[in-house]
Design a protein with these regions (language model features):
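Cross-family detector of peptidyl-prolyl cis-trans isomerase
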Residues: 2-5, 22-219
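Sec-dependent N-terminal signal peptides
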Residues: 6-16
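C-terminal motif of bacterial Sec signal peptides marking the signal peptidase cleavage site
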Residues: 17-21
Length: 219
């Protein structure tokens, strides 16, 4: 009898531990816990990778265009100390995707046609016009965006900064990392994009429309 009781205690103890373990496994983890710190740490890691790219990876960083655009005289003369959040960071498929040759730069007033997806650092997708893996031979759903100086509240500084360095028909999509200071700031946007969110965009420019482009006959 004592042996049976002993085994029963052992079995119950094992079941209790099992249930306790299951309960811990099913605890709901807040994906936005310590959100500011996680995003700042994530951006620091991206800045480090961009500064010291692994073999075979192509990275560039682009300065927030508004630093010089808002006050070109004072910003060019003052010893401004750039921070990691003063840049957007772009990972390209190849070095050839960076160099534009004689292609005109994207500028204010232009319209760009592009395929894109937007994500947060926890993998939550918040926007886009395609799903899954981008394939330039298959993807044909492009959205046109006007390039504006943040007149429209839907535009963010980092989005415009990145677009101004894109070119059409790259070998593949580029991945753009935008710090929250160049995104939706401390307040965020809507229910999905919380404050302090680093924005990650997969971006492929299909076409650039220059409304004021002149021809040789106009010169």
């Amino acid at each position: 009898m004592n042996n049976r009781i002993t085994w029963l205690v052992v079995i119950l103890s094992a079941l209790t531990i099992g249930f306790s373990s299951c309960a811990k496994d099913t605890e709901v983890v807040d994906p936005y816990a310590n959100w500011k710190e996680k995003n700042e740490q994530f951006l620091d890691s991206i800045a480090e990778v961009a500064a010291n790219p692994p073999a075979g990876e192509v990275w560039e960083k682009y300065e927030n265009y508004k630093i010089d655009f808002d006050d070109p005289i004072s910003s060019s003369m003052s010893p401004y100390q750039y921070k990691d959040y003063d840049y957007v960071y772009v990972k390209y498929a190849t070095e050839a995707d960076i160099f534009r040759g004689n292609e005109p730069l994207i500028n204010f007033g232009d319209t760009v046609s592009l395929a894109y997806q937007g994500f947060l650092i926890n993998g939550v997708r918040f926007d886009g016009n395609y799903y899954g893996t981008f394939d330039k031979q298959v993807t044909d759903n492009f959205t046109k965006f006007g390039v504006a100086d943040n007149i429209d509240i839907n535009y963010v500084v980092g989005w415009t900064t990145a677009l101004m360095h894109m070119k059409p028909d790259m070998s593949d999509k580029a991945t753009v990392y935008i710090p929250y200071q160049m995104g939706y700031g401390e307040t965020g946007k809507g229910d999905v994009i919380r404050g302090y969110s680093t924005l990650i965009f997969e971006m492929y420019v299909d076409e650039i429309i220059h409304p004021y482009k002149t021809t040789n006959s106009d010169n």
